[in-house]
């Protein structure tokens, strides 16, 4: 068993060997290394053909037209292009945007930028299980609402939003609907014909592809217009200039092809591992699963161990690669903004750990993890005076602490 055990698949996945093998063929003199925009010779044509194949593989996973796929450097860029691009293009119609407080920073920060430019943004409060209440969303919609951005699967708590229902609400009112699907592509079926979604962000590295490549689905019927954010040679039909990185695109295409093929197998594998881990730790007392356990991808388990500091727990679990919060914000010692939005108090939000597993995680690794978690939580609680008070039946919320 390789230590530390990797249980942070929501942060990134290792590249699948099938993907890596394919990518290597598009880099050196022996392979297809040309620029896909070079139209005057075979090196360019072959590279363009490889890009077209990958575009089809990505479109296949979501039942889209390959012409609706725009390559970007990742989901962050896709989110920026979708949110700023749509808001700017449709700003004559209105300047109101709706999103949710538990979105990824790559959605929240572009919304903050729009606010600085004079747009108004409504940040919906999720329910305590992490889901958006459709009636609250409907109530927030106005005549001047031009864009709604709600993620498919949350990166910290793994809950699945009802994208189909939200899409219906938006389509009725002719509001552009953007979805960040970085955490759901390859894990859940996505059908753009059934879901009335206009813009969808994808990332390769969350689906066993390489880092640094992503895509944005831009609906053609009804046609969605965007203002480009990256200007230059007019690549990607003017949506996103910049030489296409053939090897990364090929990697993303292959990763999405494999994901489509293995989706059910991967899902069942993750579900078995998730249940095994939860069964192994849930009797530890004062253990809370954050986010809805039913409407959730099985690849994620976010748990709070009361009376244990999350950072201390991570340091005690040195043989497990896990995170508290998401990798994008875990450098900050603030409690997770996602968990606080669910109504968790700072103590519980601070004591949370996200375990995420995937294609290469084994049962033996989960069993080892359970053993490590049990030892660490018990040891840290033994050192905590708060735990002793809790065990004595003292209601900690009533205690008056002295201020020094």
From Swiss-Prot:
Residues that, per the record, bind pyridoxal 5'-phosphate: 75-76, 155, 183, 203-205, 243
Molecular function terms, GO-annotated: 2 iron, 2 sulfur cluster binding; cysteine desulfurase activity; metal ion binding; pyridoxal phosphate binding
GO biological process, one term: [2Fe-2S] cluster assembly
Biological pathway: Cofactor biosynthesis; iron-sulfur cluster biosynthesis
Transferase found in the keyword field: yes
Swiss-Prot/TrEMBL keywords: 2Fe-2S, Cytoplasm, Iron, Iron-sulfur, Metal-binding, Pyridoxal phosphate, Transferase
Coiled coil: none
Cellular component, GO, one term: L-cysteine desulfurase complex
Residues bearing the modification N6-(pyridoxal phosphate)lysine: 206
Catalysed reactions, semicolon-separated: (sulfur carrier)-H + L-cysteine = (sulfur carrier)-SH + L-alanine
Active site (catalytic residues): 328 (cysteine persulfide intermediate)
Subcellular location: Cytoplasm
The protein's role, per its UniProt record: Master enzyme that delivers sulfur to a number of partners involved in Fe-S cluster assembly, tRNA modification or cofactor biosynthesis. Catalyzes the removal of elemental sulfur atoms from cysteine to produce alanine. Functions as a sulfur delivery protein for Fe-S cluster synthesis onto IscU, an Fe-S scaffold assembly protein, as well as other S acceptor proteins.
Family according to the record: Belongs to the class-V pyridoxal-phosphate-dependent aminotransferase family. NifS/IscS subfamily.
Name of the protein described by the UniProt record: Cysteine desulfurase IscS
Organism: Vibrio campbellii (strain ATCC BAA-1116)
